[in-house]
A protein has these predicted regions:
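Non-heme Fe(II)/2-oxoglutarate
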Residues: 5-82, 90, 101, 201-208
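Localized chelating/binding microdomains
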Residues: 155-157, 174-175, 181
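Extracellular-facing segments of soluble proteins and assemblies that are Gly/Ser/Thr-biased and enriched
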Residues: 82-98, 107
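A short hydrophobic beta-strand segment most commonly corresponding to one strand
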Residues: 114-115, 179-195
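Catalytic core of non-heme Fe(II) oxygenases with the double-stranded beta-helix
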Residues: 96-164, 195-203
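Short beta-strand His + acidic residue motifs that chelate non-heme Fe in jelly-roll/DSBH
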Residues: 102-105, 171-178
Length: 208
């Protein structure tokens, strides 16, 4: 009789996670007196968002320097060494009595977006997986911890933290359950100047 022993073939599996969305985190020191004065001097529309959409050159101009330094570090980390523009920035208010949270949204016509958190216990920020698949292996895929299986991630920021992420990532500000208003500055960034090479060269300029 022939040898009927089952042969076991070992298959070596390796893994490399490609095309991740880069998220960047940092901290900014906040001057409490300037912060209070700036919030008081900002006109908030409908109790939600500032009327001024260039607030880092307005009532919060003292924060432009530290925010821009963080932006420079992020852009250089992604190998964009040329000029850039923080072309929009605004104050966002999350207030309990409004009893609403933001709609799912992304930031159109922008490269990177960011948020600087100004007050204690900021509202969580939920991000949605930008990859196109929507299969999930089980209920745990809906939690906040999985990096590959999950299609959502909830970021719990702290006062003074600053975050930047690709503008195409859908996200949603969660509701405020505390009695105190929560404030943050959101902003959008574009690389400017000459980008690309050969037939892909483009010159970007932000006109305000």
């Amino acid at each position: 009789m022939g040898d009927t022993t089952e042969k076991i073939i070992l298959i070596m599996v390796t893994r490399e996670d490609l095309f991740a969305a880069p998220f960047f985190y940092g901290n900014v020191d906040l001057d409490e007196e300037k912060l209070k004065e700036s919030i008081e001097n900002t006109n908030i529309l409908y109790g939600l968002v500032s009327e001024d959409f260039d607030i880092l050159h307005g009532s919060f101009d003292w924060l432009y320097g530290p925010v821009n330094r963080f932006v420079v570090e992020v852009m250089e980390e992604m190998e964009f060494y040329g000029p850039h523009s923080i072309f929009t920035s605004w104050l966002t208010a999350t207030i309990k009595e409004n009893e609403i949270k933001s709609q799912d949204h992304m930031h159109m016509n922008s490269f990177m977006s960011g948020t600087l958190y100004l007050t204690e216990n900021p509202s969580p920020l939920m991000f949605k997986n930008p990859l196109p698949w929507r299969f999930q292996n089980n209920e745990s895929a809906m939690n906040i911890t999985g990096k590959l299986a999950s299609n959502k991630y909830v970021y719990q920021p702290q006062k003074g933290e600053i975050i930047m992420f690709p503008s195409h990532v859908w996200h949603q500000i969660q509701s405020n359950d505390s009695e105190d208003p929560r404030y943050s500055i959101a902003f959008n960034v574009l690389p400017t100047g000459t980008l690309g090479n050969w037939d892909s060269t483009v010159n970007l300029k932000v006109i305000k």
